[in-house]
Design a protein with these regions (language model features):
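A short acidic, Gly/Pro-enriched loop at the edge of an enzyme's catalytic core
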Residues: 261-270
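Substrate-binding/catalytic lobe of Class I Rossmann-like enzymes that use SAM or dcSAM, i.e.
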Residues: 306-411
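Conserved SAM-binding loop of SAM-dependent methyltransferases across substrates and taxa
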Residues: 212-223
Length: 411
C-alpha cells in the first residue's frame, strides 16, 4: 500500500487478518497433523513434482524431488490450507506478507515451479485454478482503470529507480551483446524496431500505447519521423510531454491521452510496443481495424507483445493484484489482428530470452533500491513486486512466456 496520496496502490489482502505473521499460529511448537503432511505432499504432486521441498511451521521438511533447488517455508497452518485451496492466488499474497518464505534463489524456485505446473497443465487441479480466475474486462473505461492500477504508481519516485535512465522503457530490451548495459540494450531495442519498420525521415507514425514516450522521441530524434503517440495513463503522458519539451522535440512528437481505438489520421507506420497484453483477446480484430483504418496503401507496422506458449489467462495473483486485465496471446491468437484485415505478416521474431535478461537487470536495480521503495510504499509492496519481477523472469526462462515481434504490411 502506498503511504502517500494520489497514485494507484497495490491491494494485498491481509491473509491472516493483520497482514503480518501471527506468532502463535506460526510457532514451532504448533503440532503438524498427519493430514497436513499429506496435504503438503499432495501439493507437490499436483504441482508436477517441482524440484522443491516444503518446510512446515514446526521445521519438519516434506521432501519433493531429489536434490531440491529450493525450499518453501510455510510459516503457519492457515497458510498451508490457503495454499491448497488456490495456490495461483494465495501463494503471492502469503509471500507478500511473509507467511511463505523461499530458501534459495527466488527466480530458480519459480522457474522450477513453472516447469512443474506446465507438466501438470492438463490435470483437474490446474484446470480448476484457471476456472477460479475471472479476468477483468477491457472496455475503454475498464482499460483506463486497469492501466491506472499498474502504471500510475509514481514516475520519478518508483519506476525511475529501476528502469533504464534514458528512455524509461518498460518493455523487453534487446541484447545482441549479453554484456550490454540496460541503457544500451533498450537503445538497441528501439533501433531494432525502427530498422524493421524501415523508418526514414518524413515518415508519419502512429503509436498505440506509448508508455513514457521513449520510442516516439527516439524515432523523431534519430530517424526524422513525426510521431503521434496514444496512451491512457495520465501520469505517463504528462511525463512524456515534459521530456519531449525538454529535448526540443515537442514539434515532432505529439502525445495524446486517449484510447487506441480513437486513433485518427493517415500514417505511413503503425507501431505498438507492449500494449497488446492490455487489449484483451476479444479486441484483437478491433486493433487490426484501427491499423487498417489509419495506414496508407504502402503502410507498414510492427506489434511487439508478451505472449504465451499456450492459450490461457495470467496466473490469478498477477491478474488480480499486479496486472488487471492483462492477457498475453499465443502467436496463433495474434493472427486475428492481421488476417481479417488482409495484412501480410513479413517477419516473426521471438525475443523471450532477451526479456529474461531485461528482467534480470530490472530485478537487480529494484533490489538495490528496495529500502527506498519500502519507505514510499511498505514491505508487502516490495515483496510483491520482487515476486512479480522474479516470476516474470522465471516465466521467460521456462518458456511459458514469450516475446513476439511481428512486422506486417498491406500486401
Amino acid at each position: 500500500m502506498r503511504k502517500g496520496k494520489g497514485a494507484a496502490t497495490l491491494s494485498i489482502p491481509a491473509a491472516g487478518g493483520e497482514g503480518t505473521l501471527d506468532t502463535q499460529s506460526a510457532s514451532t511448537t504448533t503440532p503438524v497433523l498427519a493430514l497436513e503432511r499429506w496435504l503438503a505432499r499432495k501439493l507437490l504432486e499436483l504441482s508436477g513434482h517441482p524440484r522443491v521441498s516444503i518446510v512446515l511451521w514446526n521445521g519438519e521438511e516434506v521432501p519433493g524431488a531429489a536434490a531440491p533447488l529450493a525450499r518453501m517455508h510455510i510459516r503457519d497452518r492457515d497458510a498451508l490450507y490457503r495454499l491448497i485451496r488456490h495456490p495461483y492466488l494465495h501463494f503471492g499474497d502469503l509471500y507478500s506478507v511473509g507467511r511463505i518464505e523461499i530458501e534459495g534463489d527466488l527466480v530458480q524456485f519459480l522457474e522450477t515451479a513453472y516447469r512443474g505446473f506446465d507438466s501438470a497443465r492438463d490435470t483437474w487441479f490446474t484446470q480448476l485454478q484457471h476456472l477460479l480466475n475471472r479476468p477483468r474486462a477491457n472496455t475503454p473505461a475498464d482499460s483506463r482503470e486497469n492501466i491506472h492500477h499498474h502504471y500510475d504508481l509514481g514516475n520519478e519516485e518508483f519506476y525511475e529507480l529501476w528502469l533504464d535512465r534514458e528512455a524509461m522503457q518498460y518493455t523487453c530490451a534487446y541484447f545482441p551483446d549479453p554484456g550490454m548495459t540496460l541503457e544500451d540494450a533498450q537503445r538497441a531495442k528501439m533501433d531494432h524496431v525502427c530498422r524493421k519498420l524501415r523508418l526514414k525521415p518524413g515518415d508519419r507514425v502512429a503509436e498505440a500505447g506509448c508508455g513514457w514516450g521513449g520510442l516516439a522521441r527516439h524515432m523523431a530524434r534519430y530517424y526524422g519521423a513525426t510521431v503521434r503517440a496514444y496512451n491512457i495513463s495520465h501520469e505517463q503522458v504528462a511525463y512524456a510531454r515534459g521530456q519531449a519539451a525538454a529535448q526540443g522535440l515537442a514539434g515532432r512528437v505529439e502525445y495524446v491521452e486517449d484510447d487506441y481505438r480513437n486513433i485518427d489520421g493517415e500514417y505511413d507506420v503503425f507501431v505498438s510496443v507492449g500494449m497488446l497484453e492490455h487489449v484483451g483477446r476479444d479486441h484483437y480484430r478491433t486493433l487490426g481495424a484501427v491499423a487498417d483504418r489509419c495506414l496508407t496503401e504502402a503502410g507498414r507496422g510492427l506489434i511487439h507483445s508478451i505472449g504465451r506458449d499456450q492459450a490461457e489467462r495470467m496466473v490469478a495473483w498477477i491478474e488480480q493484484r499486479i496486472f488487471p486485465g492483462a492477457y498475453p496471446p499465443t502467436l496463433r491468437e495474434m493472427m486475428e489482428i492481421f488476417e481479417p484485415n488482409g495484412f501480410s505478416v513479413l517477419d516473426v521474431e521471438n525475443l523471450r530470452l532477451h526479456y529474461a535478461k531485461t528482467l534480470e537487470h530490472w530485478l537487480a536495480r529494484f533490489d538495490l533500491h528496495a529500502e527506498e521503495i519500502e519507505r514510499i510504499f511498505d514491505g508487502a509492496f516490495v515483496r510483491a513486486w520482487r515476486l512479480y519481477l522474479a516470476g516474470s523472469q522465471a516465466g521467460f526462462l521456462a518458456g511459458t512466456l514469450q516475446l513476439f515481434q511481428i512486422v506486417f504490411t498491406r500486401g
